[in-house]
Amino acid sequence: MEMLLGTDIIEVDRIKRAIENGGRKFSEKVFTLNEIEYCESRKAGKYQSYAARFAAKEAVSKAFGTGIGKNAAFSEIEILKDSLGKPYVRLSGKAKEFYDSLGTAGISVSLSHCRAYAVAYAVISLGDSFKNKI
């Protein structure tokens, strides 16, 4: 089985400044309402949560091999948590169409942060049909 990998690291203060200076316009362009609700509920760690999700979106887009833009918008890559707290990705729009076209078998993400930085990794597992796409 082949895999596509993506990673990203970001300074938490960069996201904090973007949210404070760009307000809802920035937040709603980059994050879904579910993500905003979750991050805002994390009072003390809200900016770390936003930054980790931003990094995860970048990591997924890098695993796609295209980055944000042509095949995926930030708001089309949603980072959620399951009942155990494990992060997972929900795609929509162009991002989902592109993902489905790859012949994938799954996508996994891992997020982490400290006070100053957030990092994320994305792994897209490819099915046998991917070999026919190259």
From Swiss-Prot:
Cofactor needs: Mg(2+)
Recorded catalytic activity of this chain's protein: apo-[ACP] + CoA = holo-[ACP] + adenosine 3',5'-bisphosphate + H(+)
Binding site for Mg(2+): 8, 58
Gene Ontology molecular functions: holo-[acyl-carrier-protein] synthase activity; magnesium ion binding
Gene Ontology biological process: fatty acid biosynthetic process
Enzyme Commission no: 2.7.8.7
Places the protein is found: Cytoplasm
Signal peptide start and end residues: none
GO cellular component labels: cytoplasm
Keyword list, A-Z: Cytoplasm, Fatty acid biosynthesis, Fatty acid metabolism, Lipid biosynthesis, Lipid metabolism, Magnesium, Metal-binding, Transferase
HAMAP family referenced in this protein's UniProt entry, alphabetically: AcpS
Family statement drawn from the similarity comment of this UniProt entry: Belongs to the P-Pant transferase superfamily. AcpS family.
Stated role: Transfers the 4'-phosphopantetheine moiety from coenzyme A to a Ser of acyl-carrier-protein.
Protein's name in the database: Holo-[acyl-carrier-protein] synthase
Gene name as annotated: acpS
